């Protein structure tokens, strides 16, 4: 098909300079021998735009029986309900085809009786009778072809199997668990049982994002007695309403929450999770580490349905976390796309040696001068104090910048994220609070101002760029103090297919002692304050502060002495 002819259709002008009157019906021209007619051309265009092959083939009016054409006022909705979709055959039908598809995206699937992957979203209609309204919402949101993790995870989930899934950042993991979750809730015939699906996220920002995506796919979907499918984010206000019994927990089909808030509401007996059949842990490596593992255990205890399906998704999957996760599952299927410790291959990764802390500020200003600082940019630091300090330093460079961290209120964080997404902010300085799952469109550059504390943290940080098939760049600054901490990052770069210089190869080799130091967090040191103030000025300020404090102490001592003299007198 000539795409230029299609794009210019309706834009032609008559040779005499007069515009074509498109309000009149044009007479149908007869196609020359060897050429397609207009109807054939339109039919081919329709077929190419019908991604999911859901369009019904309706005969032309001239070819219909007389009694069929005579009923001009027939209700279209009745026609839709009466007609049956003829779904196309699935693209993947044999184990050999599945193996070939998996080789194309380096996918590894292990587990008893793992189902074949899907080759397209059309396969969901053929193999699993995907709900028409859910399919329509997918089309409206421009989801036309499944990503590798979606090809594998969706059919496994639709067979109610437990999953441990690992795929690179920005590879479509959210959709991989939302599509089967919504389909299973729609298919569930149980009425008035309460929450059926539960999604756990380690951060509020990620929970918000999942809620937005789930709400888009759940639009205009009705369950029993024309009740709309209800998705809720367990916010502070909703938690208060549940505690005060202003709303019933039976009202919601799917709830998305962070662990601590969910445990709090469950312990108050305001939310019953005994009917949950589909439990999803997003960013499972974080939820199963020592920070959240107790809360995760409490959630698993509250979800007591005998036929519950557990699904775990993450961009990184350490062996310790995987062992713990598999211990709570029944006959799970393990899905790995690429390497479980590798970063997204669309990201160009760089290491920059800065010598010391002062050199980092020089390096970031050099990036700005050389034109490598192309907005939008995210800069990660290891602490709130350092994030604030860098924010004040970059304000002097007249950058359109803001900072986000755990000390900001939820409203402030949401406003900053909205401004960054809309382009009002060019640069966002943050801690690891934004390192996981948040999908910012078109991030060009990620800067690790401080070396991440683990290979997993590094993969999640740089995963804010290179999402959805786009290219991105990640730059990591390191100093002499980071000699050990930078070694896991070099290994991630090698596994991701990045070019690694000879000097990097040498520092990448870790001894057993160094591995233990990194695991225990002893490879990381206390860093100096971020500042360009000269040392002599800092010393003067410190001396001035000491003088003021000494003066205050003398005054207090004098006042205490005067008071004791008055008492004796």
From Swiss-Prot:
It catalyses: ATP + H2O = ADP + phosphate + H(+). GO terms for molecular function: ATP binding; ATP hydrolysis activity; RNA binding; RNA helicase activity. InterPro entries: DDX52/Rok1_DEADc, DEAD/DEAH_box_helicase_dom, DEAD_box_RNA_helicase, Helicase_ATP-bd, Helicase_C-like, P-loop_NTPase, RNA-helicase_DEAD-box_CS, RNA_helicase_DEAD_Q_motif. CDD domains: DEADc_DDX52, SF2_C_DEAD. Its EC number is 3.6.4.13. Residues 346-508 form the Helicase C-terminal domain. One of its GO terms (biological process) is maturation of SSU-rRNA. PROSITE patterns: DEAD_ATP_HELICASE, HELICASE_ATP_BIND_1, HELICASE_CTER, Q_MOTIF. Residues 15-106, 536-569 are annotated as: Disordered. One of its GO terms (cellular component) is nucleolus. It comes from the Eukaryota. Residues 36-53, 64-76 have a biased composition (Basic and acidic residues). Residues 154-335 form the Helicase ATP-binding domain. The keyword Nucleus applies. A motif (Q motif) lies at residues 123-151. The Q motif is unique to and characteristic of the DEAD box family of RNA helicases and controls ATP binding and hydrolysis. ATP-dependent RNA helicase involved in 40S ribosomal subunit biogenesis. Required for the processing and cleavage of 35S pre-rRNA at sites A0, A1, and A2, leading to mature 18S rRNA. This is ATP-dependent RNA helicase ROK1.
């Amino acid at each position: 098909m000539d795409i230029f002819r299609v794009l210019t259709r309706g834009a032609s002008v008559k040779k005499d300079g007069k515009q074509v009157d498109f309000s009149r019906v044009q007479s149908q021209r007869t196609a020359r021998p060897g050429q397609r007619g207009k109807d054939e051309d339109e039919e081919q265009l329709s077929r190419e735009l019908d991604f999911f092959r859901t369009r019904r083939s309706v005969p032309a009016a001239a070819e219909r029986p007389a009694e069929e054409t005579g009923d001009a006022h027939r209700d279209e909705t009745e026609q839709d309900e009466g007609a049956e979709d003829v779904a196309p055959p699935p693209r993947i039908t044999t184990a050999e085809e599945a193996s070939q598809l998996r080789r194309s995206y380096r996918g590894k699937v292990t587990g008893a009786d793992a189902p074949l992957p899907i080759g397209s979203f059309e396969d969901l209609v053929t193999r699993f009778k995907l709900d028409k309204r859910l399919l329509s919402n997918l089309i409206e949101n421009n989801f036309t072809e499944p990503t590798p993790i979606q090809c594998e995870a969706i059919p496994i989930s639709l067979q109610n199997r437990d999953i441990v899934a690992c795929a690179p950042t920005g590879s479509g993991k959210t959709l991989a668990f939302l599509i089967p979750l919504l389909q299973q809730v729609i298919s569930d015939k149980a009425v008035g049982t309460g929450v059926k699906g539960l999604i756990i996220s380690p951060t509020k920002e990620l929970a918000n994002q999942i809620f937005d995506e789930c709400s888009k796919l759940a639009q205009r979907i009705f369950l029993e007695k024309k009740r709309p499918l209800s998705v809720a984010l367990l916010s502070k206000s909703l938690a208060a309403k549940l505690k005060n019994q202003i709303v019933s927990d039976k009202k919601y089909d799917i709830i998305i929450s962070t662990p601590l808030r969910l445990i709090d509401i469950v312990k108050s007996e305001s939310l019953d999770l005994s009917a949950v059949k589909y439990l999803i842990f997003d960013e499972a490596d974080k939820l199963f580490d020592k920070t959240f593992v107790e809360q995760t255990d409490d959630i698993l205890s509250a979800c007591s349905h005998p036929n519950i399906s557990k699904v775990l998704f993450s961009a990184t999957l350490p062996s310790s976390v995987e062992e713990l996760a598999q211990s709570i599952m029944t006959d799970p299927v393990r899905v790995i796309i690429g390497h479980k410790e590798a970063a997204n291959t669309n990201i160009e990764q760089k290491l920059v040696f800065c010598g010391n802390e002062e050199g980092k500020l020089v390096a970031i200003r050099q990036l700005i001068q050389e034109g490598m600082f192309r907005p939008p940019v995210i800069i990660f630091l290891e602490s709130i104090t350092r994030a604030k300090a860098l924010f004040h330093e970059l304000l002097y460079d007249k950058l359109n910048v803001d900072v986000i961290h755990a000390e900001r209120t939820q409203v402030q964080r949401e406003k900053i994220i909205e401004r960054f997404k809309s382009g009002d902010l060019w640069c966002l300085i943050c801690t690891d609070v934004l390192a996981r799952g948040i999908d910012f469109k078109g991030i060009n550059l990620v800067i690790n101002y401080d070396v991440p504390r683990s290979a997993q943290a590094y993969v999640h940080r740089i995963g804010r760029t290179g999402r959805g098939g786009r290219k991105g760049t990640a730059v990591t600054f390191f100093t002499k103090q980071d000699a050990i901490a930078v070694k896991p990052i070099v290994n991630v770069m090698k596994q991701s297919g990045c070019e690694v210089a000879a000097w990097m190869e040498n520092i990448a080799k870790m001894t057993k002692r160094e591995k233990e130091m990194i695991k225990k967090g002893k490879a990381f040191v206390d860093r100096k304050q971020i500042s360009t103030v000269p040392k002599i000025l800092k010393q003067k300020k410190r001396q001035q502060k000491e003088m003021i404090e000494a003066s205050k102490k003398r005054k207090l001592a004098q006042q205490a002495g005067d008071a004791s003299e008055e008492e004796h007198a």
